[in-house]
Amino acid sequence: MLEFSSEVSLLDSVKNILLEYGLRFQEPQIEKVDKYIEELLGVPYNLTAHRDLDSAVHKNVVEILLPLKEELKGTLLDVGSGNGVPGLILAIFFSKLKVVLLDSREKSVNFLRGVIEKLDLENVSVVKERAENFSKERREEFDYVTARAVARLNVLVEICTPALKTGGKLLFYKGPSYIEELKEAQRAMKELKVELEKVREYSLKTGERRALLILRKYESSPEKYPRRVGVPFKRPLL
């Protein structure tokens, strides 16, 4: 049986969860997260189950911020952004970032544009395009490229790295099976000229284990990558 309550505001609930993890924030940031979570859940907080709220904040905010130990600034591309995670959350908490949310699905793009307008985010834009096309057209443009729950690591390396500047970093959010993905991504990493810089493992108080994989691009990727639309997914580099 789910419990409902109107006694605690969404704003206070988000604050309390972030404080449990020792995450720092400013009031305007929490206000934007407040609006974002409400848009994500699709209903006012007083009609939302505690369980839904707790899950949304952990999955879409805490999971993104917890492993980051440094300030992010410059340009960031979020590939397969979907509901805006991680790119939208990073844009809220790192004001010096200029973020591009990339997705090929009309529904996702419309949702993201609506949220950006409601949150009045000036450092975020949305592009409707396939990652393979975008990375080929916008080579060496971004300081960071990030993704979560889009594809396995070898596919991500191919479709994301060309858009990354040499010396830039890939930030990939993964689950506990990342070690297996790293093993199968060795060819892709070699071909696309990236190396593993570090892995930050962490756990949520809800029980989930997560890892942030940070890869650095040490040389320009060959012009032949990424391959045409769909090929990296159908025939990944192994």
Swiss-Prot record:
<feature type="binding site">
    <location>
        <position position="148"/>
    </location>
    <ligand>
        <name>S-adenosyl-L-methionine</name>
    </ligand>
</feature>
<keyword id="KW-0808">Transferase</keyword>
<comment type="similarity">
    <text>Belongs to the methyltransferase superfamily. RNA methyltransferase RsmG family.</text>
</comment>
<feature type="binding site">
    <location>
        <position position="80"/>
    </location>
    <ligand>
        <name>S-adenosyl-L-methionine</name>
    </ligand>
</feature>
<keyword id="KW-0963">Cytoplasm</keyword>
<dbReference type="GO" id="GO:0005829">
    <property type="term" value="C:cytosol"/>
</dbReference>
<protein>
    <recommendedName>
        <fullName>Ribosomal RNA small subunit methyltransferase G</fullName>
        <ecNumber>2.1.1.-</ecNumber>
    </recommendedName>
</protein>
<dbReference type="Pfam" id="PF02527">
    <property type="entry name" value="GidB"/>
</dbReference>
<keyword id="KW-0949">S-adenosyl-L-methionine</keyword>
<dbReference type="InterPro" id="IPR029063">
    <property type="entry name" value="SAM-dependent_MTases_sf"/>
</dbReference>
<dbReference type="InterPro" id="IPR003682">
    <property type="entry name" value="rRNA_ssu_MeTfrase_G"/>
</dbReference>
<comment type="function">
    <text>Specifically methylates the N7 position of a guanine in 16S rRNA.</text>
</comment>
<keyword id="KW-0489">Methyltransferase</keyword>
<keyword id="KW-0698">rRNA processing</keyword>
<feature type="binding site">
    <location>
        <begin position="131"/>
        <end position="132"/>
    </location>
    <ligand>
        <name>S-adenosyl-L-methionine</name>
    </ligand>
</feature>
<dbReference type="GO" id="GO:0070043">
    <property type="term" value="F:rRNA (guanine-N7-)-methyltransferase activity"/>
</dbReference>
